[in-house]
From Swiss-Prot:
Coiled coil: none annotated. GO terms for biological process: methylation; negative regulation of gene expression, epigenetic; tRNA processing. Residues 241-261 are annotated as: Disordered. It comes from Arabidopsis thaliana. Keywords: Methyltransferase, Nucleus, Repressor, RNA-binding, S-adenosyl-L-methionine, Transcription, Transcription regulation, Transferase, tRNA processing. PANTHER family: TRNA (CYTOSINE(38)-C(5))-METHYLTRANSFERASE. Interacts with type-2 histone deacetylases (AtHD2s) HDT1, HDT2 and HDT3. This is tRNA (cytosine(38)-C(5))-methyltransferase 2.
Length: 383
């Protein structure tokens, strides 16, 4: 295998890649951003609307069959060097039932693990992304056991966009696996779970599991993050200046898409209704254009305001936060384009017009951070 690897590098052949649970293309955008010479030979995704978005941007429609119906022979025909996987996270979330492998949504990933030893050419590399909590699940135990038996070496990470200069708190679990004799560039990190991206940049001052950054470490991270205003498509306004939002609207219009769920064609339709502010104001996470941290956007953003993502104050008060009247801060939702910006999607990414606003937020909430995944993939493919 090492000779084949050397031959590939010398001949500059593109890596052949399979993309599982492709969604709206976050993994593929990460692969492109990494600079790796590669070719996605097939993508797999069961969601029809997500495939519409993927096809719109990549001119290729993913295979839409059930992954559980795949056989080892099916996978062999792709002759892929690497498998990239972002399986459903619901079995492992804190809000979910935490059934782990007992959740039906985990079955397809378990099926893929079962197939690896039966393929004639197992992938040289695997990349798995999931929520924090996956690392303590029985599915994780099954995955590591399978990979170890098949001579894979793993390096695991829990990383957030905040560690890459993006003001977005979205910690996620990542597993990088390479089959012997392929080595990782930093072998000090073999078979460890790290909370630091240092190995990606050739540094060994790693933060291992259980030694997560303290608050002072987080404060230092935020110093290097860009402000929220760099990720906005709609003008931000500060210091109580008049908003470009149409003042004839009081924000009481339903922002949750109950009037056809069409995509707003004017700024005021992203304003948070006063009724929601009065009811849920204390539970809202408010950020400002100069903020350096934004909460994770979930698939329920725009449908619910509690715990689904940050809201932007379009009028910045003299005193920030809930001490000031929230209704006077003209809170609005971040637009889908802005959420895509926080996920570091490229400027040319777009949704087909028929995809509703709720669908856009839901798909973005299920996606991943290109800013985090691209350097991880670069590190994985680097020999």
């Amino acid at each position: 295998m090492a000779e084949q690897e050397l031959q590939r590098i010398n001949e500059k052949k593109p890596w052949q890649v399979l993309e599982f649970y492709s969604g709206i293309g976050g993994m593929r955008y990460s692969l492109m951003a990494s600079g790796i010479v590669s070719e996605v030979v097939e993508a797999f995704e069961i969601n029809d609307s997500a495939n519409d978005v993927y096809q719109h941007n990549f001119k290729h429609r993913p295979y839409q069959g059930n992954i559980q119906s795949l056989t080892a022979a099916d996978l062999d025909k792709y002759n892929a060097d690497a498998w990239l996987l972002s399986p459903p996270c619901q079995p492992y979330t804190r809000q979910g039932l935490q059934k782990h492998s007992g959740d039906a949504r985990a079955f397809s990933f378990l099926r893929i693990l079962e197939l690896i030893p039966h393929t004639t050419k197992p992938p040289q590399m695997l990349f798995v992304e999931n929520v924090v909590g996956f690392e303590t699940s029985d599915t994780h135990m099954e995955m590591i056991g399978t990979l170890t038996k098949l001579d894979y070496v793993t390096q695991e990470f829990i990383l957030s966009p905040l560690q890459f200069g993006v003001p977005y708190s979205r910690p996620r679990y990542f597993c990088l696996a390479k089959r012997k004799p392929l080595p990782f560039k930093s072998q000090h990190s073999n078979n460890k779970l790290l909370w630091s991206p240092d190995p990606l940049y050739g540094r060994d001052d790693q933060v291992e599991f259980g030694k997560c950054q303290a608050e002072e470490g987080l404060d230092k991270l935020l110093e290097f993050c860009k402000p929220v205003e760099k990720f906005l498509e709609l003008a931000a306004h500060v210091d109580g200046e008049p908003s470009s939002v149409d003042d004839s609207e009081n924000g009481s219009k339903d922002c949750c898409g109950q009037e056809g769920d069409s995509v707003p064609d004017s700024v005021h339709q992203y304003l948070v209704p006063v009724s929601l502010i009065e009811r849920w104001g204390n539970a809202m996470d408010i950020v400002y254009p100069d903020s350096k941290r934004c909460c994770c956007f979930t698939k329920s953003y725009y449908r619910y305001v509690k715990g689904t993502g940050s809201l932007l104050a379009t009028v910045q008060p003299k005193i920030k936060g809930k001490e000031s009247c929230l209704k006077e801060q003209r809170l609005r939702y971040f637009t889908p384009r802005e959420v895509a910006n926080f996920h570091s999607f490229p400027e040319d990414f777009e949704f087909p017009k028929h995809i509703s606003l709720r669908q856009r937020y839901a798909m973005l909430g299920n996606s991943l951070s290109v800013a985090v995944v691209a350097p991880l993939l670069r590190y994985l493919f680097d020999s």
